[in-house]
Amino acid sequence: MSKFEKDGVNRRELLGTSLTAATLAGTAGLAAGGATIMVANQAPAHAESDDDHHKKAMVPPGKLDEYYGFWSGGHSGEVRVLGLPSMRELIRIPVFNRCSASGWGITNESLQIINESLTPESRAYLDSIGQKAYLNGDLHHPRPSYTDGAYDGRYLFVNDKANTRLARIRLDVMKCDKMVQIPNAHSIHGLRLQRYPRTGYAFCNGENRTPIPNVGKMLDDSKKWSSVFSAVDGDTMQVAWQVIVSGNLDNNDADYKGKYIASTSYNAEEGRTVAEMTASDKDHIVVFNLPAIEQAIKDGKFETINGAKVLDGRKSSKLGITVYIPVANSPHGCNAAPDGKHLIINGKLSPTVTVFAWDKFDDVFAGKIKGEEAIVANLEVGLGPLHTTFDGKGNCYTSLFLDSQVVKWNIDEAIRAYKGEKVNPIKQKLDVHYQIGHINATHGETKEADGKWAVALCKFSKDRFLNVGPMKPENDQLIDISGDKMVLVHDGPTYAEPHDATIVHASKLN
């Protein structure tokens, strides 16, 4: 943290102050021949790294990395496996794409996996254009399976936003072995897994709202469209149940007790145009009550649509399986802290993160408190907060897309500040390069978060690498978070478009 940040001056304020001071001082100097105040020469803190931190990230020839990193390939449709901390690419796992090197998407065996769970509508569409399978995919959110809140090394689950699919990769052989196309939903985006007692369910957010069933009716009345929250059985790779919700679902995450899943949501207005979708300054999160959902399925309170058991979880529903809690407009990332107690909602359009207490949802569902009373902190962190990861020591690391920074802050101090105590929860802001999206730390999404490394996935590299023409590589930056201060130690050029990554200790895989 720079002197200016300690004194409460951020980069944007410094720039404005510097320009003003330099202009005024220059004018005074011309008029009186006096010395000008060179405030503009005092630059904000940059993400400098030193030799000691660089050496920690070096893996000599013949030596092995400590961690596996699983990178989503975005529109390439593949998973990229890296070693950490070296950031060396080890292999690529084709999933939603075709691969001439391995034959994936070409051989009968792979086509069987890719096509076995396509919906009838997709099969008919592919037949009409003379294709055996989809040739593309938008692979997001690689998530390893859990047992009791820790990675168990069995599977990696990934979603396809382009064609509404979920795929499973066996981690013992690093190959895709199952795939399912999810009916009724459209554009699977948010993907997180059941942490307790095990995975269990893969929870999938259908982001875009469509008529259900989508058979060419209700096209002119968007109020009758819905997003769909789906639970896929991770063992059978079949849709277990679905919940229709109000608004557009974005990202989700599950607790560490097997009781609740929360999802960010935008377009509470349920409009179609940008003006309609952003008319309100509030949106909401949706909290799903897993035991209540499973009981409703047992009691037969579902409707079967396109072969799936579908429950009504909209605001008007009387089933008691969801609650809607207002938050600032268009929340994005949804991240469960390793302490098992807290849930972080990242504001995106709001410069804030909102902290919920998982156990307070018991009273919200019981009607004892309002949803807003489950909020225990609300902290201003910077512009464009998208995602948060954790070090297991009570600290959070939030990506700031517009500021191109990672901000380190403390949960307990944020809660104390929310109660009115004079404490500054923000510990450091680190420049990254540039426009960071996802961020993830070593085991940061488990109860075993170890606080060693974090990876910042930056959308633009700009001037960080040799020029290769108009399509620049993206930039995956390795950050040492083991000490009191974050230190940038590596720039990794990456072909478009890694969307997210998770990091697993090598000892977890067989």
Task: Give the predicted meaning of each segment.
Residues 8, 18, 43-510:
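Predominantly soluble domains enriched in secretory-pathway, periplasmic, or organellar proteins
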Residues 1-23, 28, 37:
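N-terminal secretory signal peptides
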Residues 31-47:
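Signal peptide processing junction and immediate N-terminal pro/mature segment
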